[in-house]
Amino acid sequence: MRTFAVHESTIAKRYATALAELASELNILDSIRDELAHFQALLAESPEMHEMMVSPTVSKESQHKLISTYLEYAKPNDLTANFLRLLIDKHRMALLNDVATAIVRVVDERAGRIQVKVETPKALTPSLVAKLEKSLADVTGKEVSLEISEKPELLGGLVIRMGSVMLDDSLRTQLHRLKEIMKG
């Protein structure tokens, strides 16, 4: 199963790279990101529509009719519309989330930004959030956009995720390591 997931991720990155290059040439990369995010949100809100768009048992014709209705409503630029049609034609609509995530990374990278996910056992004060943002900006040399979530099971400390890097300095992990050391 892992091989399939890695394969899909690689394909999604290829689609995202090609789309990002075209969007950059047309100077509409931010627009593409926003339009894909909008469609992605729509699919997340409607499990029935999501299932219809990704199911191999639903005909391309039915999927194209559905996407045409969406395109008439949302009126995205031609590149987004054609890209969504291409995903249908190639039976790759299931990759939309990965492609959209990769597009966000490309846009952020070009703008000198990085998305950082932080898990904490309890809410951080605004001053701690500001210090954390500054520290991460100093380390990465980029503007940091934090997504903070509370995870009481961490007990203390932080878990920080930046792209493929994870720093786990949670009390839960420290206690687990101590337990392993004591086992021998």
From Swiss-Prot:
Q: What is its main location?
A: membrane
User: Which terms in the GO cellular component ontology are assigned?
Assistant: plasma membrane; proton-transporting ATP synthase complex
Q: Where in the cell is it found?
A: Cell inner membrane
Q: Name one Pfam family in it.
A: OSCP
Instruction: Give the record's keywords alphabetically.
Output: ATP synthesis, Cell inner membrane, Cell membrane, CF(1), Hydrogen ion transport, Ion transport, Membrane, Transport
* Matching InterPro entries: ATP_synth_OSCP/delta_N_sf (IPR026015), ATPase_OSCP/dsu (IPR000711)
How would you describe this protein's topology in the membrane? Answer: Peripheral membrane protein
Description of how the protein assembles with itself and partners: F-type ATPases have 2 components, F(1) - the catalytic core - and F(0) - the membrane proton channel. F(1) has five subunits: alpha(3), beta(3), gamma(1), delta(1), epsilon(1). F(0) has three main subunits: a(1), b(2) and c(10-14). The alpha and beta chains form an alternating ring which encloses part of the gamma chain. F(1) is attached to F(0) by a central stalk formed by the gamma and epsilon chains, while a peripheral stalk is formed by the delta and b chains.
Q: Which family does this protein fall into? A: Belongs to the ATPase delta chain family.
Q: What is this protein called?
A: ATP synthase subunit delta
Q: Organism, per UniProt?
A: Magnetococcus marinus (strain ATCC BAA-1437 / JCM 17883 / MC-1)
